[in-house]
Amino acid sequence: MRRPILRNLFLASGLLALTQLTIPTQAAAEARLALVIGQSAYRTVPELPNAANDAKGMTELLGNAGFTVTTASNLAQNDMRQAISDFAGKVSASGADTVALVFYAGHGLQIDGENYLVPVDLDPKREADIPLQGVRLNDLLNTLGALPTRARIFMLDACRNNPFPALSGAGHGLAIVDTKAGAQGTFISYSTSPGAEAEDGTGIDSPYTTAALTVAKQPNLPIEEVFKRIRVAVAQSTDGRQIPWESSSLTTDFKFFGGDSSGSQAALPGASSMALASGTRSLEDWRKDLQGKPAMIAYEMVITDDRSDSVS
């Protein structure tokens, strides 16, 4: 009884090593890094409770999609700039095959066509204070745009109502940035159309994030299709009051999730279910099935199969 187990353990170890050499994983070919910012606890204007929930939900979704996620909440101006700088450093160190994604939920403003993300400590007394106290969206875009990456994705749920109505020059919503005028490989999604306001929502998440959390986890959807479906879902849930908008200069394909499941790309079938079909599995099938499996799961698959001819 001992020899088949030892033989199969050797097979599992050998196939794992062979698989790593001959069939590179998607994780090895494409690093995924994300920065998620949720701004709820504003100090001088009413809070946005859903922004924190939005960030929490997106952190979970992106983690399941294979991203290494950095989550930051309720950032003052200096902290937000530092978070962006630190994230850019991680992206730079990760290399040119990296997909970098930034999700921002919170207030956003535009002044003279320039967009600003709003730190929780922003307290302008006049319009001229906003460029000094805010964080320019273009600074974020340019910082990541200067780095060699496979793709840069920005999701901006930042077009909520103007938190400073006394400043008449602070425009409603955000101005659309044309990605085609900047670095290639950039995709920007706005939670609503140019100059319009986005709703915070009456549920635990905003309408935009609610749609994103549902649609983005569907398997095998190209990013363009994902955000088209998000647009349709948000328009329906808000009776047409809010229409998400995108600008893209992507030159490569991207899917949040591959495969046939709505879970993580790493959430492959377990050893027990894989073993059910092992009687007709070829060596090439073994290589594919063992791809990316932890050693103990691969071992269980092999000993469950327990076919002596599998080493012939």
What annotation goes with each model-predicted range?
Residues 2-311:
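Cysteine endopeptidase catalytic domains of the caspase/legumain-like
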